[in-house]
């Protein structure tokens, strides 16, 4: 464990993670300054921390303050390229991310899950397996509860953490027992200079792992396969397209687990989660517990009892023969592709939001094949309209509520309305969850035609 008493620590970013970091360092006797671009009045939930000696640097990041710190603890939403942070790095000030700081304090083995899509579902699936197995597991990270909160207890048997590329940018010694790379498609290109930089951030997950550790990788994702050919740890693959000699495979009806001379088969008809992408999530989630000795019947019962997460392809309502789905978590093109691919019948797609700089071309085939009406909202609407012009009927809406009204007008019985934005939410909402809640309320308020 690191020693922080008396050290001047600047926590950059006053979101949920930043507040957790501030509390962590205050509890250890550090002199803590919370630095944020917002004004002091705009910060919430800081009164208690202020009473315990937290100091503030508001309205921007003071370059001299950061350059004079003993340590900078950076929130994942703050790029290392922010001038004051970059200047401190150049001055030799150590800059560490939340997962690096937390991992140094935690003794329990960790499963760290990254990838472009499926991270949250896989993380929660594994947490459910651990719970049913009787193991005390912290489940969080980029999903929900920040990893730093796990340090408030020493009783964990396992740490199950969703990890983002942003979090991996500021690691040094971070080393999970199991590192999981679910898939790689274009995302966050508003933060990264290109796809190569994004992939490089994801691959940092494995850089401190050793032959004692295990990488769980998607054998069907060509970019994952190319990127993980030379890892310092063991590899266990999973595939939803074939049965593997070693690893987790799929024959179209059964998940087949082959490892160390053993074979187990699981019927996917038992699962509440639907769609091939969820078969992949289940396969990935099963691997670490089964390798650690969890009985197969307990693991399978756990995943079969899991019905999914909010705002991830959730059926909100059926009205006048139309099914309405909330997939507000679909914040990148790859996620929308998987959601559309799992739907039958004509689709009205509500998409748009804050553009992340990616390429919309991978959606073109499904837009032309399945989408009868595309209703666009938000900042990205112009780019998306240009990308899909001539492929389907395109409508524009000034708000999500207006988009729901338009969707009801144009979608006939037997059709599906899908909110799967392919963009982040921050141009119109505080989070994808708020966007999903607004959508659900608007759908529930619709009046049927009799």
Curated annotation (Swiss-Prot):
Keyword Transcription annotated: no
Keywords: ATP-binding, Cell cycle, Cell division, Cell shape, Cell wall biogenesis/degradation, Cytoplasm, Ligase, Nucleotide-binding, Peptidoglycan synthesis
EC number(s) on file: 6.3.2.9
Top-level lineage group: Bacteria
Catalytic reaction list: UDP-N-acetyl-alpha-D-muramoyl-L-alanine + D-glutamate + ATP = UDP-N-acetyl-alpha-D-muramoyl-L-alanyl-D-glutamate + ADP + phosphate + H(+)
GO cellular component: cytoplasm
Pathway given in the UniProt record: Cell wall biogenesis; peptidoglycan biosynthesis
Entries under Gene3D superfamilies matching the protein: Mur ligase, C-terminal domain, Mur-like, catalytic domain, NAD(P)-binding Rossmann-like Domain
SUPFAM superfamilies: MurCD N-terminal domain, MurD-like peptide ligases, catalytic domain, MurD-like peptide ligases, peptide-binding domain
Binding, ATP: 115-121
GO function terms (MF aspect): ATP binding; UDP-N-acetylmuramoylalanine-D-glutamate ligase activity
Subcellular location: Cytoplasm
Pfam families, sorted: Mur_ligase_C, Mur_ligase_M, MurD-like_N
Disulfide bonds: none
Enzyme class (EC, first level): ligase
GO biological process: cell division; cell wall organization; peptidoglycan biosynthetic process; regulation of cell shape
Function: Cell wall formation. Catalyzes the addition of glutamate to the nucleotide precursor UDP-N-acetylmuramoyl-L-alanine (UMA).
Annotated HAMAP family: MurD
The family this protein is said to belong to: Belongs to the MurCDEF family.
Protein name, entry field: UDP-N-acetylmuramoylalanine--D-glutamate ligase
The organism of origin for this protein: Syntrophotalea carbinolica (strain DSM 2380 / NBRC 103641 / GraBd1) (Pelobacter carbinolicus)
